[in-house]
UniProtKB/Swiss-Prot annotation:
This is Succinate--CoA ligase [ADP-forming] subunit beta. GO terms for molecular function: ATP binding; magnesium ion binding; succinate-CoA ligase (ADP-forming) activity; succinate-CoA ligase (GDP-forming) activity. Binds 1 Mg(2+) ion per subunit. It comes from Rhodopseudomonas palustris (strain BisA53). The gene is sucC. GO terms for cellular component: cytosol; succinate-CoA ligase complex.
Amino acid sequence: MNIHEYQAKAVLQPFGVSLSKGVAILKASEAEAAAKQLPGPVWVVKSQIHAGGRGKGKFKEASAGSQGGVRLAKSIDEVKQFAQEMLGATLVTLQTGPAGKQVNRLYIEEGSAIDKEFYLSLLVDRATSRVSFVVSTEGGMNIEDVAHDTPEKIISFSVDPATGIMPHHGRIVAKTLGLTGELAKQAGKLTTQLYTAFVAKDMEMLEINPLVLTKDGELRCLDAKMSFDSNSLYRQPDVVALRDTTEEDAKEIEASKHELAYIALEGTIGCMVNGAGLAMATLDIIKLYGESPANFLDVGGGATEEKVTAAFKIITADPNVKGILVNIFGGIMKCDVIARGVIAAVKTVGLEVPLVVRLEGTNVEEGKAIIRDSGLNVLSADDLDDAAQKIVNAVKKAA
């Protein structure tokens, strides 16, 4: 689960992290009052969307102006102008894809006199099964370029969960950033604060980009990006309250209501599979034969007929779907249950695109009989390779 920048800063504040003052707004009419709560004479007007690269992004609408999603205002009138232009407009960044995201919230923040910009993040490192820090002197909007062109400028280290954060971790951060004396002490303190917040709130990722050194000698988190482990949300009700469903894919929201693992992709072949490994293999073989998957959808091992029907409805709700592949290996999940769910869904929502069903495992003959006797135009496949070729050929033929 992701949250907005202003929410992330509110999460960090109780842990003592040094932050700039700011006010979030939902309406352009609130911009003047928000700016007057901050000292000025410079304000930063920031688009709040669940995507990075806002500063380099561009708005689709000409009425939003030529500047990006993060703008520097030198007067309250300019704050008001930017708010009027940006709210309701569609911001396109490298992370949003060409469709972009509508800006429904802005964060108006006091300006900072910046001396240096750094990069600091924490993440759950699968390789070490620990929380790892990623640190670089090359902060700001171009960290992706740094990672690609000069990876030696990025330093990482992990924290042993048995000991937790220790003073030497702070010293590593300070040394990497070239900080000494009082600034090294600030770096050590910040390292502890961020790690404590990361663990306490069950985060998956915490990115501070940039972490700045102000001209008056203070380390300050100028931006904050946060994501949380969805499996831990039951014990983080304050985090759940921050969820903004307008930033999420409507199909993914519907899938979560039925406990379906669904991720929207950009292809044309909808997939319904049981088991994450088989689902990944299904996506791969679709690509192998020249098409792209429209989604990842794992119905799980104990899906009911109703759950399968819901999954099918979610897939068919995607206008980009030109064909559907159902690939089931029945273990706990029974093939006849899948078959009944698919037939029920087809009868409910209709079938306007090719459908290929591959069943194998528990009650496979019963499942195939249900599909065969349904009278519906469903193609049956004997194995995964056969299924992938049939759906790809059917989609190309229908195009």
